[in-house]
Amino acid sequence: MPPWLPPLVQMADYGNDWDEYLAALYQRFSIDFLGARPLFDGRPTQLKRHPVSEGKEATFWHFISDGSVEADRLPNLRRCERIAWPRAIMDNCADPCVKMWREARGSSINFHLWCEEAMYLVVVADRGSFVLPWTAYPIEYEHQARKLNARWEKFRT
């Protein structure tokens, strides 16, 4: 693992109490993205705020939950544990262990930050004058990693 990658934030450290754990996750997210707004690619970082759920921004929910229907997303403990990783990977995107490329999908362009050593992907939407951290998640299967590496290789050529 890269030495700059923060440790996992585990639910057991909060007595397996979901409410306490959720508060700790949001506190870390707030420190990383609300307190000191990072610059990425020389541009300010904004957040996808809507839909706001339980007083928390959509970006936060995308970092800690999964599901294709926004209102039905469910917490994913592997995503939760890695709440500190999106900012760290964005801040260290020039590190050789982070494979970064831009990719068009429909009418949008996204940066993909693939930290293969940690099996973790961060997606940052390019909005011209600013960027939006869109989602971030662990890569669970080897075939997913192979696809990401193929996309990275396609970008490089």
Model-predicted segments: where are they?
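Ribonuclease/tRNase effector modules and their secretory precursors
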Residues: 1-157
